[in-house]
């Protein structure tokens, strides 16, 4: 009996070696089907899934590290991962990523480093952004650069260069990329990338104005609030694409001129000298300032007489600059900055209507024909207006063009009177000659009438 037992135990040790037993014990539980996995009761705490997730027991045990697993083919599996194919966790296809795909535009969530992930099926080259400030130090991520490149692909080269120049300027004045966009409802705080994304680059462009001022550190009474003040966001306006490209070309020309001057170009130095002389000449011209809050009565009477004395007085100049500003301290401020506490925008609308009325009244005064002034304007009603007014050259001291026209009319009247006198004398002479000479045709008529009467009488007598 003992011999028989030994013979039975001997072959069994071949099939159950220590290695196979170790593998069998350490092998995790794998259900045969999803339905079987759901119906099977949960047991053995190390194989139970996490609470609130739909991960399989195997994913629970080995973790949910997407970067470790790599792709769905299972080529980059861990040391303890023996199963391949469908059992390997897929990239961007687990529970944590699926919950964020709808809110993130279909791109992977932040746990896969989505800030630097490029959009799918994207064949764009962003290497030409390498020298731009906004492409460095994480100001614009790679994904943002891909989106920006896709937007700029449909525009012209000059438009692309202008927008890149504005974005480089924005790096220094808006570190977090947030700006105040001027809309019909007032200022709207938004990211600059959304502003560019919503532009029609065939018609629309942008302009950036920095609002670096220290007025917020003081109250209306003049008391100091303190050093901790919120930094002001730059103001962005939607403008025609032609104006944006023109402003960029002018700025580029200035930079090129400075570069030529630094290289010692004589031609550039002469042009700079001419510009400085014209600027000094313009600064020596007389100027007068009106505020937007002026009353219509003062504007039409007192201020208008002051303007006429500047141009037509004994010591008047040939040119005067008229400034329409908010006040002396806030001459360059926008109406949106002055009434920034107006949430509904009602004060801004009323102020803009009043400024339009002041502008219309001033231009009606300048277009007076009796004065004969010529003028040009720069700026807008949102910030300030500058009128350059010149008077026409006149002859004979301070006579205006109206007096010259009056003398021409008087001269024409005297010439006409002389012509009428000559014609009247000629007509009177011809009438006197006609009265002095006899009229033979009248006598012949009388003779004919007498002969006819005699013939008529003789005819009656014969009867």
Curated annotation (Swiss-Prot):
* Bias kind Low complexity: ranges: 94-114
UniProt xrefs under Pfam families: mIF3 (PF14877)
- Here the segments flagged for biased composition (Polar residues) are 48-79, 391-405
What family name appears in the similarity comment?
Answer: Belongs to the AIM23 family.
Q: What is this protein called?
A: Altered inheritance of mitochondria protein 23, mitochondrial
The primary site where this protein sits is: mitochondrion
Please provide, in alphabetical order, the Gene Ontology terms of the cellular component aspect for this entry.
Answer: mitochondrion
- Transit peptide, from-to: 1-69
Q: Where in or outside the cell is it found?
A: Mitochondrion
Q: Which residue ranges are recorded for the region named Disordered?
A: 25-124, 208-229, 391-449
Instruction: Output compositional bias ranges, type Basic and acidic residues.
Output: 213-224, 406-423, 440-449
List UniProt keywords, sorted A-Z: Mitochondrion, Transit peptide
Q: Highest taxon of the source?
A: Eukaryota
């Amino acid at each position: 009996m003992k011999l028989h037992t030994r013979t039975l135990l001997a072959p069994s040790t071949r099939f159950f070696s220590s290695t196979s037993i170790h593998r069998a014990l350490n092998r995790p539980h794998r259900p045969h089907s999803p339905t079987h996995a759901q119906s099977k009761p949960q047991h053995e705490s190390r194989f139970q899934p996490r609470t609130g997730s739909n991960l399989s027991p195997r994913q629970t045990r080995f973790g949910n590290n997407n970067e470790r697993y790599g792709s769905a083919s299972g080529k980059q599996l861990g040391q303890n991962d023996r199963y391949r194919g469908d059992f390997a966790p897929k990239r961007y296809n687990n529970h944590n990523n699926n919950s964020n795909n709808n809110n993130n535009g279909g791109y992977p969530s932040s746990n896969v480093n989505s800030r630097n992930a490029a959009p799918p099926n994207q064949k764009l080259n962003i290497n030409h952004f390498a020298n731009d400030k906004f492409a460095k130090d994480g100001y614009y991520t790679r994904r943002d650069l891909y989106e920006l490149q896709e937007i700029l692909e449909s525009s012209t080269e000059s438009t692309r260069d202008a927008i890149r120049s504005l974005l480089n300027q924005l790096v220094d004045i808006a570190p977090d990329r947030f700006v105040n966009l001027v809309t019909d409802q007032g200022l709207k705080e938004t990211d600059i990338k959304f502003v560019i994304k919503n532009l029609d680059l065939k018609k629309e462009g942008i302009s950036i104005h920095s609002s670096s001022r220290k007025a917020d550190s003081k109250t209306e009474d003049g008391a100091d609030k303190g050093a901790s003040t919120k930094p002001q966001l730059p103001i962005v306006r939607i403008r025609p694409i032609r104006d944006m490209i023109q402003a960029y070309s002018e700025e580029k020309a200035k930079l090129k001129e400075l570069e030529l001057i630094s290289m010692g170009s004589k031609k550039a130095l002469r042009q700079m000298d001419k510009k400085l002389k014209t600027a000094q000449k313009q600064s020596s011209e007389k100027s007068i300032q009106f505020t937007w809050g002026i009353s219509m009565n003062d504007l039409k009477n007192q201020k208008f007489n002051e303007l006429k004395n500047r141009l037509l007085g004994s010591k008047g100049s040939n040119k005067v600059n008229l400034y329409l500003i908010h006040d002396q301290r806030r001459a360059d401020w926008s109406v949106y900055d002055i009434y920034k506490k107006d949430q509904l925008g009602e004060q801004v609308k009323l102020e803009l209507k009043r400024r339009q009325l002041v502008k219309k009244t001033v231009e009606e005064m300048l277009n007076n024909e009796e004065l004969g002034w010529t003028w040009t304007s720069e700026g807008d009603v949102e910030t300030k207006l500058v009128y350059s007014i010149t008077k026409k050259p006149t002859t004979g001291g301070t006579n205006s063009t109206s007096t010259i026209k009056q003398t021409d009319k008087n001269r024409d009247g005297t010439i006409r009177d002389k012509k009428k006198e000559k014609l009247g004398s000629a007509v009177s002479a011809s009438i006197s000659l006609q009265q002095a000479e006899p009229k033979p045709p009248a006598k012949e008529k009388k003779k004919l009438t007498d002969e006819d009467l005699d013939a008529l009488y003789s005819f009656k007598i014969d009867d």
